[in-house]
Amino acid sequence: MTDIVRGFGVLLGPTLVLDLFVVAGTLAVVTGRGFDRRKGAARLLRPLALLGAAFPWAYAFVIRPWHLRWGATGEEVDKPLPGDDLVPEPGIESTRAITVEAPAGKVWPWLAQVGQDRGGFYSYEWLENLAGAQMHNADRVHPEWQHRDVGEIVFLHPAIGPKVAAFEPGTAMVLEGWGVFAVEPIDEHSTRVILRSRTPRRLGVLLYYLLTIEIPHFVMERRMLKGIKERAEKGRNP
């Protein structure tokens, strides 16, 4: 139960901050005249209210489009990837990518071994462990962790995780409910790592994702891409 409570706190924290800005913006509109009558309070509250009013718009039209396609080219955003067929008409789609200055054969092993009970996710380990994930990020490639069977669970937490929908060694791994981890060579010395997630076009699912998952997902996934890049470029192999 403690892990569940901590998990919700970690998950909801960033989104609650956004919600507070929305509330502040609403109050700015509703009580604007009252601020004029209470000049002392106005001096304290008006900057916060203005920020609260502006932030949701900035998030919707600037920040959100940026983070949904962080690091990805227009071509990468538009092209089909393995696993797209699992959610053919998504309500929300994110495509994020990073360039790794290492050959694809040196990058793929880091992706292949992701999982709570394997190499971790190369993200904010301390934050994952606040939610009781018991995560440890590997700093080397483990040969014994280089294969996944379709239907196997990739654990995010000791008790939960998505199933493997497809595993194409050296190319892509698709997880149900998450999306695809893909590796695409640029040339002999550099590689693109692409992560795509698709959320079904169902109102309840979309609301849940927007209100609880979207911001933490970006924060953790961005760090994961950077973590893979750092490890592959250092070439830490057994």
Predicted feature descriptions by range:
Residues 209, 213-225:
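Short, charged, low-complexity patches
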